[in-house]
Every structure is written in structure tokens, then in C-alpha cells.
Amino acid sequence: MIQQESRLKVADNTGAKEILCIRVLGGSGRRYAGIGDVIVATVKDAIPGGNVKRGDVVKAVVVRTAKERRRPDGSYIRFDENAAVLLKSDGEPRGTRIFGPVGRELRDKKFMRIVSLAPEVI
């Protein structure tokens, strides 16, 4: 579960290393984001010469959460860290590579480009 002020690792090659969630999109009272949800975040740490720099406000989709999530078949999915992939305004990923596994929920939420770039879908 991601909420305001949560820090997430960036799982793509845009140059950002860490982001801080400033808003969960999807309704005025929405408090938490899970796998496949879009957030607004600010870049807290970035590598020099990357596509984004520290202080940039970006949209991102959550691809891994440390809090377990129950799936419709009764199984649970949990990761070691919270991670996100930065998005362009049209919903496509900004980077050309995705690092680490991503949740199957991204396929249900129509993030097919991220699913195809990911090395593993769990």
C-alpha cells in the first residue's frame, strides 16, 4: 500500500532512483495505491545525465509493493520493496527497460508495454 509521503524505488532506466508519492490518483478521497495504480510523485534521487532530474513532478505506476495483496484465486502476492515505473502523459513508460519482476495486475489494468518489457511477471 502506497500513500502520500511513501518513497518508492524506480524500476526503469529513466535516470531516477527514488521517488516520493505526493498524490494517489483515482478519486478525491483515495488514500492508498496498490499494484497497477497511478500516482503523482516527485523525484528525490536521480543519476546525472538522466531523462529526469531531482525535483521533477512525474506520474508513475506502482509495479511492486511490500504489503501483500490478495488475488481473486485466494493467493497472496508480496515483494521485498515498493517500486514504480515512470509514465509519459499518454500512459506509456518513459524508459526503455524495466528492472525486476512486476505484478500480474498490470496486465488487467492495460499496462501492456510495461508487461512486455518486464523480465518477469508474477
Curated annotation (Swiss-Prot):
GO terms for molecular function: large ribosomal subunit rRNA binding; structural constituent of ribosome. InterPro entries: Ribosomal_uL14, Ribosomal_uL14_bac-type, Ribosomal_uL14_CS, Ribosomal_uL14_sf. Disulfide bonds: none annotated. PROSITE patterns: RIBOSOMAL_L14. The keyword rRNA-binding applies. Part of the 50S ribosomal subunit. Forms a cluster with proteins L3 and L19. In the 70S ribosome, L14 and L19 interact and together make contacts with the 16S rRNA in bridges B5 and B8. Binds to 23S rRNA. Forms part of two intersubunit bridges in the 70S ribosome. This is Large ribosomal subunit protein uL14. It comes from Beutenbergia cavernae (strain ATCC BAA-8 / DSM 12333 / CCUG 43141 / JCM 11478 / NBRC 16432 / NCIMB 13614 / HKI 0122).
